[in-house]
């Protein structure tokens, strides 16, 4: 069901607000994640930090998508946003996979402490809250770009909690040191698969809409 003009503009503004909040929050989480990754040698923390950086970029793309009030229903703008997101997903997944494989190959052991736990819990909760808000707005505005941004936040939430799980397992079972790197690889593969699917779905649609919709 298509929204009335005033409803569409109201939800467009909410999408902009959520995107701005997401940019600020995930930027802070990215810095915290990279700090934990380098200080505690955690591949899953690096994966989370990279995903948080990706979340910042995807929220910026959503900002661009809804920055023009007249283009709130623009299919062409929507599809371009999704193609850009797909490319970013694939590039970031390669970095996450590279770091995780390197850590497994060199048998880099993660260091576990309270700082790691606190960062992972806060990160996981914040990302899940952002994901729910983006999914809700994405469904109302029927926006694949917003839903994709929400998916990215949800992955960030899962990764935040995965840091906690792998660290706790390593604390009690040091012989399962490879869990951290394995989770990093799995997350990298999920992000890569979603990025490829976005490109396969959206590139043909960008070409189709280019001819009959004026680019805003």
From Swiss-Prot:
SUPFAM superfamilies hit by this protein: Cation efflux protein transmembrane domain-like (SSF161111)
Name of the molecule in the record: Transmembrane protein 163a
GO molecular-function term, one example from the UniProt record: zinc ion binding
Superkingdom: Eukaryota
GO terms for biological process, alphabetical: myelination; oligodendrocyte development
Function recorded in the entry: Zinc ion transporter that mediates zinc efflux and plays a crucial role in intracellular zinc homeostasis. Binds the divalent cations Zn(2+), Ni(2+), and to a minor extent Cu(2+). Is a functional modulator of P2X purinoceptors, including P2RX1, P2RX3, P2RX4 and P2RX7. Plays a role in central nervous system development and is required for myelination, and survival and proliferation of oligodendrocytes.
Sequence ranges on the Cytoplasmic membrane side: 1-15, 65-77, 136-144, 204-216
Subcellular localization: Cytoplasmic vesicle, Secretory vesicle, Synaptic vesicle membrane; Early endosome membrane; Late endosome membrane; Lysosome membrane
InterPro entries: Cation_efflux_TMD_sf (IPR027469), Tmem163 (IPR026765)
Transmembrane segments: 16-36, 44-64, 78-98, 115-135, 145-165, 183-203
Catalytic activity: Zn(2+)(in) = Zn(2+)(out)
Record-stated family: Belongs to the TMEM163 family.
Coiled coil regions, renumbered to chain: none
Outcome of gene disruption: Morpholino tmem163a knockdown severely affects central nervous system development. Morphant larvae display locomotor disability, decreased survival, and myelin deficits associated with a reduced number of oligodendrocytes.
Residues exposed to the Extracellular side: 37-43, 99-114, 166-182
Bilayer disposition of the protein: Multi-pass membrane protein
Keyword annotations: Cell membrane, Cytoplasmic vesicle, Endosome, Lysosome, Membrane, Synapse, Transmembrane, Transmembrane helix, Transport, Zinc
Main subcellular location: membrane
Gene3D superfamilies cross-referenced by the UniProt entry: Cation efflux protein transmembrane domain
Gene this chain is encoded by: tmem163a
Assigned GO CC terms: early endosome membrane; late endosome membrane; lysosomal membrane; plasma membrane; synaptic vesicle membrane
């Amino acid at each position: 069901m298509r929204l009335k003009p005033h409803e569409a503009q109201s939800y467009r503004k909410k999408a902009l607000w959520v995107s701005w909040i997401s940019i600020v929050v995930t930027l802070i989480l990215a810095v915290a994640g990279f700090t934990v990754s380098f200080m505690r040698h955690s591949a899953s923390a690096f994966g989370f930090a990279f995903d948080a950086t990706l979340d910042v970029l995807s929220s910026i793309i959503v900002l661009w998508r809804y920055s023009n009030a007249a283009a709130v229903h623009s299919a062409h703008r929507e599809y371009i946003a999704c193609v850009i997101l797909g490319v970013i997903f694939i590039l970031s997944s390669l970095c996450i996979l590279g770091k995780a494989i390197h850590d497994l190959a060199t048998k880099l052991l993660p260091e576990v402490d309270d700082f790691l736990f606190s960062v992972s819990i806060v990160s996981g909760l914040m990302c899940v809250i952002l994901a729910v808000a983006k999914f809700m707005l994405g469904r109302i505005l029927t926006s694949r770009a917003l839903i994709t941004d929400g998916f990215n936040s949800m992955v960030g939430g899962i990764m935040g909690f995965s840091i906690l799980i792998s660290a706790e397992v390593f604390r009690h079972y040091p012989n399962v040191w490879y869990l951290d790197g394995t989770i990093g690889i799995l997350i990298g593969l999920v992000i890569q698969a979603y990025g490829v699917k976005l490109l396969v779905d959206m590139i043909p649609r960008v070409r189709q809409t280019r001819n009959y919709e004026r680019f805003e």
